[in-house]
Amino acid sequence: MFGQTTLGIDSVSSSASRVFRFEVVGMRQNEENDKNKYNIRRSGSVYITVPYNRMSEEMQRIHRLGGKIVKIEPLTRAAG
């Protein structure tokens, strides 16, 4: 079909193991995150570690909570 891409098994497994760290500012306490057992800091940055397959979902959640993503960086595993 037009617009679809076929991925091999290698590309799926490599994307499943990739992890990224979001630096977020402006998160605010609201009804959604009041369900957590901790408060969100009002000052400074919050760092959130996210697997590749959940990046879109996490970006939407951050936006709903009033946060702004200022940096996204890949986390690499130490060789060894």
Curated annotation (Swiss-Prot):
rRNA-binding as UniProt keyword: no
Keyword annotations of the record: Antenna complex, Membrane, Photosynthesis, Phycobilisome, Thylakoid
GO biological process: photosynthesis
Subcellular location: Cellular thylakoid membrane
One GO location term (cellular component): plasma membrane-derived thylakoid membrane
Lipid bilayer topology: Peripheral membrane protein
Domain CpcD-like: start-end pairs: 17-75
Disulfide-bonded cysteines: none
InterPro entries, sorted: Allophyco_linker_chain (IPR011064), CpcD-like_dom (IPR008213)
Main location: membrane
Record flagged with keyword Membrane: yes
Superkingdom of origin organism: Bacteria
One Pfam assignment: CpcD
Role of this protein: Rod linker protein, associated with phycocyanin. Linker polypeptides determine the state of aggregation and the location of the disk-shaped phycobiliprotein units within the phycobilisome and modulate their spectroscopic properties in order to mediate a directed and optimal energy transfer.
Family (UniProt): Belongs to the phycobilisome linker protein family.
Protein name: Phycobilisome 8.9 kDa linker polypeptide, phycocyanin-associated, rod
Origin species: Mastigocladus laminosus
Gene it is expressed from: cpcD
